[in-house]
């Protein structure tokens, strides 16, 4: 079995909606393979939301004008194409814009329903004079990529409904480059740098995660042809390797009190991995292993970033009965001659 070093992915935020992602080290050639796939997926396949059609009060078609409005309908449509929205609704959703002049009309004047959010409230849509009045019904749908107005036009749609081009993609720009990087004595490994800029409706981090999920699903189709086919296995991450090392440690490394240590040993628990596979209820079933011992174990595990099976997160060691550091604290290996000296089988907490 061939095992490659696991690459790391690090995000370097440049601004709120632009980040640079560095993936390294990659086997020679994989930088361009991943970079091209990620770029194409980010630009074309990230789900988003957009306005698909509008209906303006008193307007029958897109070549009309609206009394009291400086912009004609064509200009209004061009401005609405710049609107940045997000939607949690799978079905088409309607939102409304109603404004009386004089003054400017911006995206902040739109009243979105529940599940829809306007992310570009400062976008200028139109200008009204003293007698100007604008009422627009906007239909928002979810999708991906680009859909033309002709494709958005539905058979038998109502008179006055104007379909518009929809740009669903929340990603504005993606570039990548591949550099050489060194691993031990080899200098031909790849470092992939992907620069992602998005609209305010999604963060670059979420866009990158979405692209990765899509690619994993698609490449998984090839793996299904033969699940046992040999490939290059990716080694464990540094965090996984450190966790595996901690789990393999003997419980002697926890520096427990004599009573807790002896109880665990008699139960056949020899490593930290075996210990964290037990729940509090399992440990309380051990004879002479009471709540003080539970608190001690949880405190020691918490210092290592671990916890017992099914334990709720957020254990506060200060809530435990604090006997550590006092005269009654007796680490199991502080003095071998005292091992078990104070351990009484029948004593209960």
From Swiss-Prot:
GO terms of biological process kind: DNA-templated transcription
EC assignment: 2.7.7.6
Stretches for region Alpha N-terminal domain (alpha-NTD): 1-226
Protein name per the record: DNA-directed RNA polymerase subunit alpha
Function: DNA-dependent RNA polymerase catalyzes the transcription of DNA into RNA using the four ribonucleoside triphosphates as substrates.
A Gene Ontology molecular function term of the record: protein dimerization activity
Chain spans, region Disordered: 308-349
């Amino acid at each position: 079995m061939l095992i490659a070093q696991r690459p790391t992915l690090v995000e370097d935020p440049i601004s709120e909606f632009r980040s640079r992602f560095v993936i390294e080290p990659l086997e020679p050639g994989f930088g361009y393979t991943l970079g091209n796939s990620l770029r194409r997926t980010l630009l074309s396949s990230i789900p988003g939301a957009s306005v698909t059609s509008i209906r303006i009060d008193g307007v029958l078609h897109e070549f009309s004008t609206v009394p009291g409005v400086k912009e004609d309908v064509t200009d209004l449509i061009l401005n609405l194409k710049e609107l940045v929205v997000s939607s949690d609704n799978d079905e088409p959703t309607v939102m409304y814009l109603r404004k009386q002049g004089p003054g400017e009309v911006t995206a902040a004047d739109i009243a979105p329903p529940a599940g829809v959010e306007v992310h570009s409230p400062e976008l200028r849509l139109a200008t009204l004079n003293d007698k100007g009045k604008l009422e627009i019904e906007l239909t928002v749908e979810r999708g991906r990529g680009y859909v033309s107005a002709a494709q958005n036009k539905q058979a038998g749609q109502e008179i006055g409904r104007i379909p518009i081009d929809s740009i669903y993609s929340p990603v504005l720009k993606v570039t990548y480059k591949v550099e050489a990087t060194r691993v031990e004595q080899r200098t031909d490994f790849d470092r992939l740098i992907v620069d992602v800029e998005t609209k305010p409706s999604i963060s670059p981090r979420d866009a990158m995660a979405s692209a990765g999920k899509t690619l994993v699903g698609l490449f998984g189709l090839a793996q299904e042809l033969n699940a046992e086919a040999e490939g290059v296995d990716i080694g464990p991450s540094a965090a996984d390797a450190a966790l595996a090392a901690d789990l393999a440690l003997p419980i002697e490394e926890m520096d427990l009190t004599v009573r807790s240590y002896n109880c665990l040993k008699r139960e056949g628990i020899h490593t930290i991995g075996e210990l964290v596979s037990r729940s509090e209820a399992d440990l309380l079933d051990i004879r002479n292993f009471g709540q003080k011992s539970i608190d001690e174990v949880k405190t020691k595990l918490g210092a290592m970033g671990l916890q017992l099976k099914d334990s709720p997160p957020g254990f506060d060691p200060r809530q435990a009965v604090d006997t550590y550091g006092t005269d009654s604290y007796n680490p199991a290996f502080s003095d071998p001659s005292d091992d078990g000296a104070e351990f009484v089988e029948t004593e209960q907490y």
